[in-house]
Amino acid sequence: MVQITLPDGSQRQFPGPVTVAEVAQSIGTGLAKAALGGRVTEPGGEPRLVDTSYRLEHDAQLAIVTAKDADGLDMIRHSTAHLLAYAVKELFPDAQVTIGPVIDNGFYYDFSYKRPFTPEDLAAIEKKMTELARKDETVTREEWTRDDAVAYFKSIGEDYKAEIIASIPANETLSLYREGNFVDLCRGPHVPSTGKLKVFKLMKVAGAYWRGDSNNEMLQRIYGTAWATKDDQDAYLHMLEEAERRDHRKIGRDLDLFHFQDEAPGLIFWHPKGWALWQQVEQYMRAVYNDNGYQEVKAPQILDLSLWKKTGHWDNYRENMFTTESENRVYGLKPMNCPGHVQIFNAGLHSYRELPLRYGEFGQCHRNEPSGSLHGMMRVRGFTQDDGHIFCTEDQLQDECADFTALLQKVYRDFGFHEVLYKVATRPEKRIGSDDIWDKAETALMESLRRTGCEFEISPGEGAFYGPKIEYTLKDAIGRHWQCGTVQVDFSMPVRLGAEYVDAQDQRRAPVMLHRAILGSLERFIGMLIENHAGAMPPWLAPVQAVVCCISEPSADYAAQITQTLKKQGFRVQSDLRGEKITRKIREHSLQKVPYILVVGDKEKQNGTVAVRGLGGLDLGVIALEDFAARLAEDVAARRDVVQPESSAN
């Protein structure tokens, strides 16, 4: 007798071994048709995903997985990657298959082929995938020995797959999945038949080196997306279109904010308007430092290699560091700011009464990121962090973490981000410090989030090598997630670098060090801001807050006068005194996302007024200049958007 416990606690008895599919059928025909797999927990074991054909030999807990579950969607995407490889082999028999994992919102598969795949090839492959899916071929799991699998794949000319399998220990039993004439190595699980794969689309082809090594052959990576329903896929494709429209690289070029060029890969050339935006962000964060007990500091860009060895960075991070030599000494260009802040702390002797001691820096860092991973401002080699380090006692740790989370939430709201996700990243395999230290650090982070009422997930093994951290992830206007701020506990670096304070018993002790950043990379955060607002920055951030346009030459002097008046009040204002038609001026400045356009002619000049247009078609009519200045000042003080109604100004 086999007893199966379902998620609602109900139990079903079977006379002998039973498959996941049979359990689903016993519950109902609808569930049996929808079943893609199962989540099984057997006595003494961890939950794991299995195929519908998996046989339950003993009592177990079972949840039927369908397309409505996240695991079910992953199974659909994984199986669609296999369907892609199946279709490619049908159309291009000489192509060799390599790997095909699930990624965010889809999948990819890498192929070796004698010529590049064309857009026409992609269309043909997608059509073939649809044909194979409609055949509803059964997907079956088979177990092979390693040597048999190597021999098989070599015999059919699949050298890459044979190489992968040959690297697996000889005594390990392998699982292969078969659908029609196609067989592939895979742990699984997979959907029960190709007919379950109804909604998918191939997106693009890109290059990828075999095993990620630039010394190896360049393969062709076909990306695709797959979904449970057509509505879900349509929503995703619409989001991609919107993301393309909001691409910070395009907007940065169109609005004359910044540019990139080949002579400086991963680095940014800031134009005047872009740098004005940068300054607003930096000045805001400087006020955050000042208002929350941080002392701003500045540490050197390069430090002797001996210091990076002491911190552990050289052993754990050397491949990402730039180095330089001078007078027979080797220096590392800093990838992080923390060692410099410890040196500042160490420059004097500190009492426990001074703690917590908070340092903040707009620290410029450089990391030797692979050229293929660079992406506009989102992935760069040179960047500036709003980097802070808090030196405190163990007793102060939770308070500091909780206070930081509350501060971070306010900052994000001010910048227009209202949804934050929280993750605690725990100890990685490659780390420094004892398990006892890691236990203390992880507990402190989790308790601080509980105290601030934040629900959080745990990301096992995702912490930095020197300590666990909280990762703060933002959700933007089109639903994308951006990992942004962090706070990280570090018991190790202060000890390694000899940081000490004198406690109440007049004993020297190492402080706890918190690494914290709210924005993270300012470059990346500004890229996020640009995309979140589609380039239309709220007045407090806009590089140019208003443009004064004269209708004709007689009103040009009045336009210039207004511009100077507003500038003297601290506003970022420009004038447009060209002899162009006013409609053209309005259109041009609207395309430049200027929050306010002030139009003045003879009537406005006589009455000392301005006709005000707000971005997005907002018509504020003709008002006194003083009233406009007051409105703009309120916009800046409240950090509100230009189209926000007056009734919700407070």
UniProtKB/Swiss-Prot annotation:
Which superkingdom heads the taxonomic lineage of this protein's source?
A: Bacteria
Q: Key word Kinase present in the record?
A: no
- Broad enzyme group: ligase
Annotated Zn(2+) binding lies at 338, 389, 515
Q: Name the cofactor(s) required for activity, per the record.
A: Zn(2+)
> Might you report a single GO cellular component term?
cytoplasm
**Which reaction equation describes what this protein catalyses?**
tRNA(Thr) + L-threonine + ATP = L-threonyl-tRNA(Thr) + AMP + diphosphate + H(+)
Region listing for Catalytic, in residue ranges: 247-538
Location of this chain's protein in the cell: Cytoplasm
Q: Does the keyword Cell membrane apply?
A: no
Family, according to the entry, reads as follows:
Belongs to the class-II aminoacyl-tRNA synthetase family.
Q: What is this protein called?
A: Threonine--tRNA ligase
Q: Name the species this protein comes from.
A: Bordetella petrii (strain ATCC BAA-461 / DSM 12804 / CCUG 43448)
**Which classification does the entry list for the species?**
Bacteria, Pseudomonadati, Pseudomonadota, Betaproteobacteria, Burkholderiales
